[in-house]
UniProtKB/Swiss-Prot annotation:
GO terms for biological process: co-translational protein modification; translation. Binds 1 Fe(2+) ion. The gene is def. Its cofactor is Fe(2+). This is Peptide deformylase.
Amino acid sequence: MALRRILRIDNPDDKKILTTRCHPVRLPNPALKQLVADMFETMHAASGVGLAAPQIGITQRLAVISIPPVVEERPDGSKVEVAPEQNFVLINPEIIKASDQEDVGLEGCLSLPGWYGEVPRAAWVTVEYTDLNGRRQRIRRATGLLGRALQHEIDHLDGILFTERIRDLSTLKDYSEEMAPTAAE
């Protein structure tokens, strides 16, 4: 596995790649497993939830998503995992159905680190894709973080940046200093 450089929206050369509609992945592809491993490693190192291939300079319709486990605290203070981590490898994904209802939520992007804005998204989506084993899969009516991540990563594959979805640009703010660890941490 290898860390890849994440392209940035504020770099003109990178932005050309980030705003390009990606080509379908041709299968079988022997190099794909290594690329996917690199993408997961890069995404986790950057504390991300999703990463699309164009974010590392590859204009193919490929994305990875990692939804963290859901942990609840019990009355005695102990913690219990109520939903496991979910990892997805999305090859040639497409949204086949989307809710007419919108959900506005705070969203960021590894290609614009530290910046977040309120982005309207469909309240749920159904997505079809091919998995790493070459099988067609379907995620039905994905909501919450998974639904938002699917829409965000598929936008990347279509050359659309999350900043283009923001209706009120005054909600786009740099939180990097607020999120930086203090000397005591």
